[in-house]
């Protein structure tokens, strides 16, 4: 943990084989060795290590620099993080002992990921709202800034009103994760589900406020939405 905190090492995460196993992919762990393929491993661009899981929820750590570990970058519309396919050919792994004894370790890891993605979406939505408000203050039409028109005001107000409760939802989900274990999974799922829906609405409204410019790469709204 100290090395992670000091940025000496960094991790990519690939748990999709446990969440939604595929017939043409998967990891087989045999003692301290593992073979197979893990798809949609996130944050692999600068990772020195990867946390991977098999279909049973057993997690292991592999080193990106090992010769038996092959990284294949995947093409994605999401430019905020790198997605990879990790191919293991009898690679050395460190199995997380707790994960082989109980499903609690993989469950908590997945729930933590849900909460972090929800928080990520809240931040992206706030950026889109801020950009929309600033644009509405500057863009002029019919001799007036468009922010003075009631329809534009309504869109900005609706985005802000829908997003504000999401801060509390994410905060409560994070609180439950450590302090209310019986509600942790429900709140993790609820926060990710609700914030995702609100974020889609914010992206749509933000694009409407920007008009045709909202569809261009110049303003970058699509970056935050994706």
Task: Pin down the residues of each PLM region.
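Alpha-helical interface subdomain recognition
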Residues: 7-8, 33, 95, 99, ...
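FAD-binding core of flavoproteins
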Residues: 2-130
